[in-house]
Amino acid sequence: NDYSNVSISVKSKDGNSDINYEFPKDKHHLIPIYGLYADYNNTVVISSEGVDKVINIKTDKLPDDFVYVDSMESGNFRFYNGNYPYAIDSNDEVRWYLNGNYYGDILVLDNSNIVIGSDKYTEDGNTISFYEMNFLGKIYHEYLLPNGYYGVNALYNDNILILSDKLMLIDLQTGELIEEYIKNDDYNYICPIEDDIIVGKDDLYSRVTDG
């Protein structure tokens, strides 16, 4: 039996924020390594069928124009999008970023891919689509929105809510429009709660009833 699974552990500086992920059994593995610190000699443990191999990966520093957003939010792994999309760990250390001028919120899917606005912009500064991609930037799907994508999204019943000129529900598998709700009134927040959807801007919130 030549099938084997592989697990990766990127060791943290403090010993409490390792990044671990696994790959299912297969004959051949092409293993991406993400979760590395910038400008650091990272320790990575690759494990398969009870055998561990330790490697070291030295990384470059962050780009000179990298903008770091200070945040008071808590959590083990938080995503932001400044002039680069990036993620930080519980110690506010950057552990992942993408090259490219992508737009809007970063949403992590159950398959460990992300949803993010594309790097294709209209003259008024809105992007015309959003991507499903992996953490290395490989694009699997592009969803076109003729009236623009405003960078706000949320998962809803295994589909995705997005803000274009209206609040829309889109099938992530097919890209088809499932439903349109209210007109976008400069909203910058979506939060599904059971069968309702909360949209908001600034400190004002509205409830949208599905159906």
Region annotations inferred by a language model:
Residues 23-27:
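Short proline/glycine- and polar residue-rich coil/turn motifs
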